[in-house]
Amino acid sequence: MDKTKLIAVAACLALFINPGCNKDNPSDPDEKETKPTKEMFDSDYFETYVDPVTGVVSYLFRSDVFSSTTKYNTQSAYFSSKDMTDDERFCYFFISTKEQNGQMSTERSARVFDFKERKFYTFAGNSGCYPFLDPKKDILYFYVMGNKTNSGKVRDNGQFFKKDLLNAPRKTEELAKIPKAVAPSGSYMSRACSHITLTQDKRKVLLDAWVNNSFIQGLLNLYTGEWEEWSRNYTTHLTHGQMNPKRSDEALFAIDVWEDSNGETHKIVYDHDGAYGGQGTYPRMQLMKPDGTRTTISPSPDNNYATHEGWLEDGDHVYWCAGGVHIRNIRTGEYEHVYGQRATHCNISTDLKYVTFDNDHPDYYRGGRWKVCFLNRETGKTIDIITQRPAITTKDKPSQLHPDPHPHFVCNNKYIVCTSSDDEGYLRWCITPVDQLIRLTSK
């Protein structure tokens, strides 16, 4: 990153903890105090980035804190996830070595960072399933896919795990394995779930498994291994499963294209409902009940398209991108057009006052330049958090790391987290205080 864009924080902590060192006794779980911003994001672990156009201040995880000889990428969670606890104690991110000419990095894993103790904990977070960090109880849930066997033709196992970060951060508790009813012996499991999302009691995980040429949805009890199948089909790719954040009897899924084991591509088929001038409703967003019944959530009346959808915290609204940002109340059908210019991924604050989104203009390829933005809905004003994130690959050799910014609110809307990048081609976990964004868009 250009040194003119990096400003060292004035106050450094006197206490420096070796990232590989963990105390035997974790701190008191009842202690909830947080450090002032300059101490939380001290220069031992973070670099301060000031956007050269807007002046917005963000903090980037340093790429050299894990090794004295090797720099690493640090990536945030998906836009619909939380990767920081509400008490501001823990965050997690993915790490990897630098891509070379669009080739997948050779080392990939994940870390938890303890903001209070200034130390890291390693976990296996690279199995194609985004972990779940309970923001209120500071418990991390993650999944490990089984190894391929029979010359790569078989992958029929996997297991869930959890870490209690407040009380036993060095310990990993084993949870349920993928049942044979989902992945029979000798089958090939491409995916167990896209994101770990849990029922209200945090005992069951929603699966949107892809096994051989079948797509299976349902709930797996993490503690007993009991499997409750909701639906199974062999034609429609249901992915990005997300439990309703307020109830355990419905989930949001997305229909996407897929390629079967014979190499045939299956495109999205519009609903045969005569809507949108006879074209039929674009069925990207699907609401599913435990009996397997599905209902299409209609996109904008003026734009029959949707992508990158998610739940609002109330469990009654979903949001999505389609050029801009959109919201629909799934109970009443009421629709709202939130933002009209380009947005690729978005996330909305719990009070619905603020929106963060990213924009892949002008490159439109994975690993290209991006901008990350903030919208104050009360004033209608926007500001760039990152006016232009540098490209990390070229268009002819796109990134394999899914390096999109994926901005999202954390800590009860206090911060926005995303994945940024630097001029050396490294990805950087980035956190931005929201209060300055509100102030800058209130003038």
Label every PLM stretch briefly:
Residues D302, V338-S349, G380-F409:
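Conserved blade-ending motifs and adjacent loop-strand segments that build the rim/top face
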